[in-house]
Curated annotation (Swiss-Prot):
Keyword Cell wall biogenesis/degradation belongs to the record: no
GO biological process: cellular detoxification of fluoride
Name of the molecule in the record: Fluoride-specific ion channel FluC 1
Gene Ontology molecular function: fluoride channel activity; metal ion binding
Membrane-spanning intervals of the chain: 33-53, 59-79, 98-118
Record lineage: Bacteria, Pseudomonadati, Pseudomonadota, Alphaproteobacteria, Hyphomicrobiales
NCBIfam families according to UniProt: crcB (TIGR00494)
Binding residues for Na(+): G73, T76
GO CC list: plasma membrane
Species of origin: Brucella melitensis biotype 1 (strain ATCC 23456 / CCUG 17765 / NCTC 10094 / 16M)
Keyword annotations of the record: Cell inner membrane, Cell membrane, Ion channel, Ion transport, Membrane, Metal-binding, Sodium, Transmembrane, Transmembrane helix, Transport
Length: 123
């Protein structure tokens, strides 16, 4: 139940932020999805350390399941990132599509690491 409720909250947050970014950014780069995924990676890195979560127990408690799997799972979007890249490729912007995918993965890894390091420093 908590995962479903959290997923709804996260999805609404993704929609809201994507809409706001879309009102101000009109370029070809899918900035909304990029910012959503990077911020989600930062938050999950931070909270996983704060909650003391490892890979095997991240689905365990209601708090972990509701926040990490539910909210952040609904908020971030791997499938939209892939669709954005396909759309760019179909528009003849294959180079931008590759840049977007590489930048998303590397920035996401860095953001998750940074979130985890910040949580370690505070704890």
């Amino acid at each position: 139940m908590w995962v479903g409720l959290g997923g709804g909250v996260g999805s609404l947050g993704r929609w809201w932020i994507g809409r706001i970014v879309g009102e101000y950014h009109h370029g070809a780069f899918p900035l909304g999805t990029f910012l959503i995924n990077i911020s989600g990676a930062f938050v999950i890195g931070y909270l996983s350390v704060l909650f003391g979560v490892d890979w095997h127990d991240r689905y365990g408690t209601m708090l972990n399941a509701g926040v990490l799997t539910g909210i952040l799972g609904g908020y971030t979007t791997f499938s939209s990132m892939q669709l954005d890249a396909v759309k760019l490729s179909h528009k003849g912007q294959g180079g931008l599509a590759v840049f977007y995918l590489v930048a998303s993965v590397l920035s996401g890894l860095f953001a998750a690491w940074l979130g985890a390091m910040l949580a370690h420093l505070q704890g």
